[in-house]
């Protein structure tokens, strides 16, 4: 497993890009405050660097609520969204931190649907975000990677 210092990218972090997207947001957005210790712990569990959009969301936020909480993007966890990205997946999609996962739960919506990053276990392109609606057992390919999914959630028509 990579150490925290290996996961924190100070030369080319993705957070400034996310801040640009936040400034363009067409939907109401609430960035939940992070707890530094939880952010570090969740980043280690995910093993994703802050150079990636996912790593930056985990490390810089307690989560992101879009459209008054209609869509909830997992970060490092907070009082309003008490689930960290890494912790939420352990026991659900992974046996332990950094273990391979068929998919990785990244967000959910108020209707009861789940969004997951395909780790190769869903029928479709690995790395794409998939949606599991509450009324069907079929995962649907959103045809976007994590970064494009977050950008769509912020500026697109939900």
Where are these regions (language model features)?
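Compact, glycine/acidic-enriched structural inserts
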Residues: 125-158
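A surface-exposed partner-binding patch
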Residues: 1-122
């Amino acid at each position: 497993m990579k150490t925290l210092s290996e996961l924190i990218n100070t030369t080319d972090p993705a957070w400034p890009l996310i801040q640009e997207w936040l400034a363009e947001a067409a939907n109401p957005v609430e960035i939940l405050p992070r707890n530094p210790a939880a952010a570090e712990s969740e980043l280690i569990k995910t093993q994703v660097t802050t150079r990636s959009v996912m790593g930056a969301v985990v490390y810089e936020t307690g989560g992101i609520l879009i459209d008054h909480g209609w869509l909830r993007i997992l970060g490092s966890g907070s009082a309003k969204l008490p689930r960290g990205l890494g912790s939420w997946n352990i026991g659900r999609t992974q046996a332990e931190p950094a273990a391979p996962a068929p998919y990785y739960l990244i967000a959910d919506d108020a209707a009861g649907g789940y969004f997951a990053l395909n780790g190769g276990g869903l029928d479709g392109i690995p790395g794409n975000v998939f949606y599991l609606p509450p009324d069907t057992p079929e995962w649907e390919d959103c045809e976007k990677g994590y970064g494009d999914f977050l950008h769509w959630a912020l500026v697109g028509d939900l």
